[in-house]
């Protein structure tokens, strides 16, 4: 059982919902990434999602695009991101870390080389936005063989065929993108999300995390009633943007603590 699977099993046993915060590695500065990761765990995160900076993040809204730009100004590479995970693992061997990004940096490193380096660093899973499940059977199998989970995105426009492919190739959890569009955009219709997740669960037996558009504790709580976990990214990055650097770590922990409290009420 992978660390992600164990985490969801433990949450289910306690009748709790998962909290999965997202930050972009290297933003607002590389030396803050590992302290931010620890602060998010201290604030109640169950799984961490670490964004790999990329110059053309097509699924991201302006907030995460700016985060990528800031990280790339520090020349943060995939190699550096794996270094952050290794550093984090020195003092936290239990919290799962999922890398989220795009195919290009992985292709440049080579899929097998990436999987081996990710395993050595202590990565638990990947979300590769532009790797559809039907095109990465081999990559998914290599990840699973190395105790990591290939996590795939589903959206309001996903066909039944795509949902079945995610059921076949995915593991760990499935990430339901609650809005058509980019991260950080409009408000969520929880009833619509509930109906879509019900349809997905007919095929996908994995836990389902919902992200895109979760802005505050109330939205997180509403979404958690129909899912197994909530993913929250743009709002955390906005907190970091609006906070002086010396208070960034504290601000992230305070924000995520508020979300955790709402989920547990």
Swiss-Prot record:
This is Tryptophan synthase alpha chain. NCBIfam families: trpA (TIGR00262). It catalyses: (1S,2R)-1-C-(indol-3-yl)glycerol 3-phosphate + L-serine = D-glyceraldehyde 3-phosphate + L-tryptophan + H2O. The active site is at 49 (proton acceptor), 60 (proton acceptor). One of its GO terms (molecular function) is tryptophan synthase activity. Its EC number is 4.2.1.20. Keywords: Amino-acid biosynthesis, Aromatic amino acid biosynthesis, Lyase, Tryptophan biosynthesis. Tetramer of two alpha and two beta chains. Pathway: Amino-acid biosynthesis; L-tryptophan biosynthesis; L-tryptophan from chorismate: step 5/5. The alpha subunit is responsible for the aldol cleavage of indoleglycerol phosphate to indole and glyceraldehyde 3-phosphate. It holds the Pfam family Trp_syntA. One of its GO terms (cellular component) is cytosol. Belongs to the TrpA family. It comes from Herminiimonas arsenicoxydans. InterPro entries: Aldolase_TIM, RibuloseP-bd_barrel, Trp_synthase_alpha_AS, Trp_synthase_suA. SUPFAM superfamilies: Ribulose-phoshate binding barrel. Disulfide bonds: none annotated.
């Amino acid at each position: 059982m992978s660390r992600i699977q164990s985490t969801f099993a433990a949450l289910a046993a306690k009748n709790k919902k998962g909290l999965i915060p997202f930050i972009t590695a290297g933003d607002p500065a590389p030396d803050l990434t590992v302290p931010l990761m620890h602060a998010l765990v201290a604030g109640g995160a169950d799984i961490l999602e670490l964004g790999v900076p990329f110059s053309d993040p097509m699924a991201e809204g302006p907030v995460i695009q700016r985060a990528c730009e800031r990280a790339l100004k520090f020349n943060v590479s995939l190699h550096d991101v794996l270094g952050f995970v290794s550093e984090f693992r020195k003092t936290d061997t239990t919290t799962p870390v999922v890398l989220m990004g795009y195919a290009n940096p992985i292709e440049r490193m080579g899929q097998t080389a990436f999987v081996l380096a990710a395993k050595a660093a202590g990565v638990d899973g990947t979300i590769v936005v532009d790797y559809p499940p039907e095109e990465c059977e081999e990559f998914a199998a290599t990840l699973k063989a190395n105790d990591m989970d290939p996590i795939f995105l589903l959206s309001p426009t996903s066909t039944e065929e795509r949902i079945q492919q995610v059921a076949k190739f995915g593991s760990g959890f499935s990430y339901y993108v609650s809005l058509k569009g980019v991260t950080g955009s409009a408000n969520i219709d929880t009833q619509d999300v509930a109906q879509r997740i019900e349809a997905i669960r007919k095929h996908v037996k994995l836990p389902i995390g919902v992200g895109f558009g979760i802005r505050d504790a109330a939205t997180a709580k509403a979404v958690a009633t129909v899912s197994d976990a909530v993913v929250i990214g743009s709002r955390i990055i906005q907190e970091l943007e609006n906070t002086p650097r010396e208070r960034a770590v504290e601000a992230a922990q305070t924000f995520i603590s508020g979300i955790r409290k709402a989920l547990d009420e």
